[in-house]
Design a protein with these regions (language model features):
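A glycine-rich, Thr/Ser-enriched phosphate-binding loop motif common to dinucleotide/cofactor-binding enzymes
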Residues: 1-9
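Generic hydrophobic, helix-prone segments enriched in Leu/Val/Ile
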Residues: 7, 78-79, 130-131
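Proline-rich intrinsically disordered, low-complexity coils
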Residues: 18, 28, 53, 91-93, ...
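Rossmann-like adenosine-cofactor binding region
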Residues: 66-121
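Glycine-rich phosphate/diphosphate-binding loop of Rossmann-like nucleotide-binding domains
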Residues: 13-77
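Glutamate identity and glutamate-enriched acidic tracts
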Residues: 5, 19, 35, 40, ...
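Adenosine-phosphate binding glycine-rich loop
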Residues: 99-159
Length: 159
């Protein structure tokens, strides 16, 4: 449910303006996460591409419902985007990639009124526990920061 928020935060961190950015959403199959992200992003991302089997149906719906500029790509087509967002085990394309399904992306969450518990516990783990115990709703939690994985040639341990 937070995929669009994570993508927007990553775009902001990379300096990609939604009204000019070309964003590709890539997945090996249709999923609720892909559809929810596409619906949410189509509201403000100017150029949105879907690279998923049967993506034509979703693209058509978004064009009709939202008037969004959404087009589809075949999975073997070269993806020319400012940022490619890969869900699940989609093969990583060339260029800048946000691999949501790989676990390589680090996301920090925030919520209000954690009190003294935030000084004792890891804040992200505390927020997850509050959400799991129904003490916080999803709309009370926001994405604070997104750290992209290092490039292949970078050492993740260096500052």
């Amino acid at each position: 449910a937070k995929a669009a928020e994570i993508i927007r935060r990553a775009m902001a961190g990379l300096g990609l303006a939604p009204e000019r950015a070309r964003i590709a959403l890539c997945a090996p199959s249709q999923s609720a996460a892909l559809e929810a992200a596409a619906r949410e992003l189509s509201k403000d991302v100017r150029y949105l591409a879907l690279c998923a089997p049967n993506g034509e149906r979703l693209a058509r719906t978004l064009r009709w419902d939202c008037g969004a500029s959404v087009h589809t790509l075949q999975t073997d087509e070269r993806i020319a985007a400012d940022l490619s967002v890969c869900f699940d085990d989609f093969p990583l394309p060339d260029g800048l990639v946000l691999p949501l399904g790989s676990g390589a992306v680090s996301v920090a969450y925030g919520t209000e009124n954690l009190g003294d518990a935030a000084m004792i516990w890891n804040e992200d783990q505390l927020i997850c526990a509050l959400y799991a115990s129904l003490a916080r709703r999803a709309d009370e939690i926001w994405v604070k920061d997104v750290k992209m994985p290092p490039d292949g040639g970078e050492n993740a341990n260096l500052p």
